[in-house]
UniProtKB/Swiss-Prot annotation:
NCBIfam families: rpmI_bact (TIGR00001). GO terms for cellular component: cytosolic large ribosomal subunit. It comes from Chlorobaculum parvum (strain DSM 263 / NCIMB 8327) (Chlorobium vibrioforme subsp. thiosulfatophilum). One of its GO terms (biological process) is translation. Pfam families: Ribosomal_L35p. Residues 17-41 are annotated as: Disordered. The gene is rpmI. Belongs to the bacterial ribosomal protein bL35 family. Residues 25-35 have a biased composition (Basic and acidic residues). This is Large ribosomal subunit protein bL35. Keywords: Ribonucleoprotein, Ribosomal protein. GO terms for molecular function: structural constituent of ribosome. SUPFAM superfamilies: L35p-like.
Length: 64
């Protein structure tokens, strides 16, 4: 049986941290920012962690 391929789209969107959690970028922070307030755009540029219910599924895609 051949090796499992990692999901290239998931690899571009998610990163595994050293402690084993999965990091992601927030949506809606790349363009059309002129009508969003400054506090919101600042928060959108910060990365966050993936929810624990989806973590196992995403790890399987990026570490396959």
């Amino acid at each position: 049986m051949p090796k499992m391929k990692s999901h290239r789209g998931a690899c571009k969107r998610f990163k595994a941290t050293g402690s084993g959690k999965v990091k992601r970028e927030r949506m809606n922070g790349s363009h059309n920012l002129e009508h969003k307030n400054r506090k919101r755009t600042r928060r959108l540029h910060q990365s966050t962690l993936v929810d624990s219910t989806k973590e196992k599924q995403i790890k399987r895609m990026i570490l396959a």
